[in-house]
Structure formats: structure tokens, C-alpha cells
Amino acid sequence: GGIINLGNEIAGPRAGGYVCTDVEEILNLPDMDFTKGRIQETLLACKKLREEGEHVVFEVAGPFTILNVLIDARYVFKGMRKKPEVMEKVFWKLGDQILKYMELVKEYGGDLISYADSSGGVNILGPKMMEAVTVNFTYPFLKKVEQLADDKTMILLCPKTTLALIGTEKAKFVDHQ
């Protein structure tokens, strides 16, 4: 639903404009359509590469990165302060769609699924907001994502997400032999 500037040889893809000015508008956006457009072409490319014996790493963006294309960040921060119950619904609306996408990536043969939300780091959100998001969304969301991991599919987490989970004691480092 976002307006995307695909970029050029100097700068890559980025938001071209916002489609929402209030966080409640996000709840009225249609679900992602995985059956057409670039998203479908990417899934088909994944399938073809796996059929040819290649390993496929699929990067999946988290809710803050997606929101960064849909709405100005100041409205997101305002919503988190003044409308936390709406923001929880927004996170889960996006989270459910992200999870569906990850399920499709697995179905199409993606064997490494990388989850990153660079716009949702502690350096942007601050420690208090980061902790709230990690406890109320990121951790429960990733518990659902964890179900996708098996002997054919590995889930990779970006360092910011990993450190947020460790910092809130929702995860710990474990040595594997």
C-alpha cells in the first residue's frame, strides 16, 4: 500500500510518499496481496532458485520498517504514546501479514529467512519504547515465527532484534557444538 521510489544508481528504494496520516488509517489498509506484482515475482524467483539447487536467503522487514513507508514516523511515535491500544492492533495487523509472507517464503523453498527491523532499533525508539515493543510484540511474534524453523528452514535475526530480546531477558546466548 505504500508509495515506493524504486531509486537509481545512486540511492536504492525508499518511501516516495505516505499513504496515511493517522495510525488508525493503517488498520483500514487492505492485506498484502502475495499473488501478483513484485512480491509474487520474488516468490517465484525463490522457487526457481531452489529448484536449481541454490540456497535462498530472504530478508523480511519488520513493522517499523514497513510503517516507515506508510506513515511519517512522528505519527507512529505519537500513536505509541497516545493510542497504545491502536498501535498494538497495528503491530499485529502487520505482524500477521509478515508471518503469512514468511510462511509463503518457506512454501516456495526459501531456506534462510532473515528478519530485520532496522527502523525499530533502540537508537530510534529509546530504551523504554524499545522494551515495550519487544515484550508486547517482537517476542510473541517471533515465538510464532519460530514454528517455521525446521531441518530445511533457518530463521535469522538482525543484531538489533537479538540484542533487544536479550536486553529484555526474552532470549539468551547459547553455545551450540
Label for each model-derived stretch:
Residues 1:
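Segments that shape or occlude catalytic/ligand-binding pockets
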